[in-house]
């Protein structure tokens, strides 16, 4: 007997909606300068690529939770960066953080079927909400005040039904830093798992890099990746750490799902986590680029404040919504940016600009803005 119900049709992928902007930006000599997607383009460290090449013949299944070398390297990096005390047994690998974000709600709901709601920032990475949708769950936005989650705005009934609260600090797309200590305390008080996506932590400008794990492990997870830190987005390697019971459960269920980072990638990524020098070089690049574009955009009376963290400028212009501002930038400078609507209705009057193009391309964008 056929089931009767409403079938799921995936929406258009957000960045597929930018083709018109790319066409407008193509009229410039030198072509468009695509700052719409936060994919690093700078070269990774040579020693990481050399290690990957050495392991290319490996064919065996790697441990789903990650090799001990990989987990130890990730733990040692966290301990250096955040003054923590983790071992490789306290965390596990994931196939890049997007995969983890998209699958977490479904896995947690199997364990806590009475909870059916995912809470996430009103302006945020679209996959937080999509992960809830793919699991057949409710997704509820949490308002932001000065870039931070306004926990007092969450309806009591949604708190009772909440499976997880997502946080992202530094934020994609706003670049804001959140009160991680306050989030951890709120989650413990209400019995809601708080998952802090910290993949931009290395690019924190307003303070030292911070992790929610500095405020204890119980009831929280932190999520990290080498995609942004080490310019290795295509490697698809990250890890999660925190609440021992949750980490243990996820290790088991993810193993059943067959989720694993290829062994040669883990070996190369372990070397990336062990080295901080290449990250300092990248920090310098992004800081210079953010300063360059933040200043150049003033020529069009675009407000593009230097972020507290991340490699994004969250921009606005009085009288224009995000699509209109994106159109203006494409027409006047050949820049392709992401309208803020892609990150939630609360972002309608903004655009996100990712400074991930090489220096010469961003200098060209700045020159076009100066001449406009």
Question: Where do the model's predicted regions map?
Answer:
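N-terminal small-domain helix-loop-helix segment of the aminotransferase-like
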Residues: 2-99, 272-273
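PLP-dependent enzyme catalytic core of the Aspartate aminotransferase-like
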Residues: 76, 328-337, 343-372
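PLP-dependent aminotransferase-like
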Residues: 106-167
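A short helix->loop->beta-strand "cap" motif at the edges of active sites that frequently abuts
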Residues: 116, 189-193, 218
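Active-site phosphate-binding strand-loop segment of PLP-dependent enzymes
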Residues: 145-206
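Conserved core segment of the aminotransferase class I/II
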Residues: 216-287, 372
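Conserved glycine-rich beta-strand-loop-beta hairpin in the small C-terminal domain of fold type I
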Residues: 266, 270, 286-294, 304-316, ...
